[in-house]
């Protein structure tokens, strides 16, 4: 039951720990010691190396490690039309840690033009060899959820229906642009579906005047509209992320509150689901995954610490998941990226690659 196309039995979410060379170069660029071209040359070399490392671990899919980004999402938003970043009053609260204080707001009509990440993907594709290059971008719901109505200029979008229509169109244009650049494997990273699983987050949603279940239906509609006309040879995955900043997290709670809408109606090709601890709940919500139509990539190997999982324990969990979704629809990956922001998680590069090798080893044994 090996798979020779995306998603792969052994897959990855995307980001890797930034090497010291990249960290130093970014500091030098920020202080004016080097220019953008010199920074990019350092990033190019680091990306070439991280691609080689992924292949050496037995992966058939490679990413650029998100080495050109400081954040998994803000850097993409910065390149959209009608969006600007601003300094907010406080960062995002994780479990005991707070991020830098940034936000994004919509100040004009949304659109996708000549985005700089298109060139980032072209470089990745040029050095991928026989491996499949995967591009990762945030999901459209992420742009809306954090600020909601207050971060959308009411003179530009007095009616949110028009905003959501343009949001979907912007992502549909992005999908087509990456496809035209040669991308055949695209991943949408989405923290919002995990928020909608958390009772604490659902309470906060109610307090701001929104309905979590209605938001879920809205985001499903936006995603499906963005996916309209997707070429048959393009694989699109949706990574449901519970928060991943310096080895901490935001959301806890099983997938049951969103399972029927998410798995039953969202037309992506694969769901990347975090299942590395008890906060993720059991596998019962997977019963809503449509038979034969979609893959479920189970994130059973944590990226939040360096201790290796017991392979037999992981295999047992795969068998448990197969009670709810067919085994041929299941793949394996780390639970998230290793560095969703440039700070990275609390493990070493050696431990990171041990984790990736564990994924490929287990997948080889099982499939």
Regions found by a protein language model. Give the residues of each.
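Domain-level signal for soluble alpha/beta catalytic cores
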Residues: 1-367
